[in-house]
Amino acid sequence: MQGDLAALKRRLKELGSCVVAFSGGADSAFLLDCAREVLGDKVSAVTVFAPYTLKRDIRRAGGIAEALQVPHLNVDIPLPDALRYNPRNRCYICKNEMFALARKEASRVGAGHVLDGTVADDDEALRPGMKALKEQEVLSPLYECGFSKEDVIDQLNKRGREAWIHSPDSCLLTRLPFDREVIAEELTRIEMAEEYLLSGGVDPVRVRSDGTTARIEAGRDCRRLFFSEEGMNEIAAQLKKFGFRHVSLDLEGYRPGSVDD
């Protein structure tokens, strides 16, 4: 798959002005970079910060927007009632809320469109949030112009934006089983545990939680970092300080969606 950069720039020029729903991920970062290049001061970004949003994503989004000198609105929201018990359609509910807020920002600044960073190899069957895109009339120029995730990484490298490339993240709700109450303190200790493990070179990593037990999923190339008695004792002790009673390592390593296996 090969994204058409010229077509993307033409499409952005046609749109005239926009607000980018900006997660800080590589895809939306590349889109924001291109939009800034084509539209200049007629582009802005909005990032929604909920209790289940990773703070590292918020920091990353703010840094990129600042580097591009793009006006950037952070919208801090409480946990929506519809997400309190982590329903199976959580992605749709979250995206619908996020895009509605982005539309409000677009209306406030007089921008004609809301854009997001969906790419051509995002599987619609696995991305229920894509339903919200259609309902909220959000446009996905990278998708329209055939950009895959690999294309985005290639373009970021060509632009000298290597620092914007990182392991894919997902919100903290994905660390919890479906249909169980979301507790703020549990989200906090999950994020603290992941930040600790990332600081030790474990990337990607997910800390799945059932309330009292942390199940660590490490990238397959990182699993070897755990296999020493001293290292395992240190990790277990630190995660217990964060509030977990039990700590385990998933020997199969990181795999998306495994919390519901």
Located regions from the model:
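Short edge beta-strands and adjacent turn/loop segments
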Residues: 199-215
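Mid-to-C-terminal catalytic subdomains of enzymes
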Residues: 143, 147-149, 153-197, 204-205
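ATP-dependent adenylation/nucleotidyltransferase module used to activate substrates
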Residues: 1-158, 199, 214, 230, ...
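Flexible loop residues that form catalytic
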Residues: 119, 176, 252
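Short, low-order "capping/linker" segments at domain edges
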Residues: 257-261
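Short Gly/Ser/Thr- and Asp/Glu-enriched loop/turn motifs at secondary-structure junctions
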Residues: 167, 209-213, 251
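C-terminal, charge/polar-rich interaction regions
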Residues: 205, 224-234
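A short interface-forming secondary-structure element
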Residues: 211, 215-228
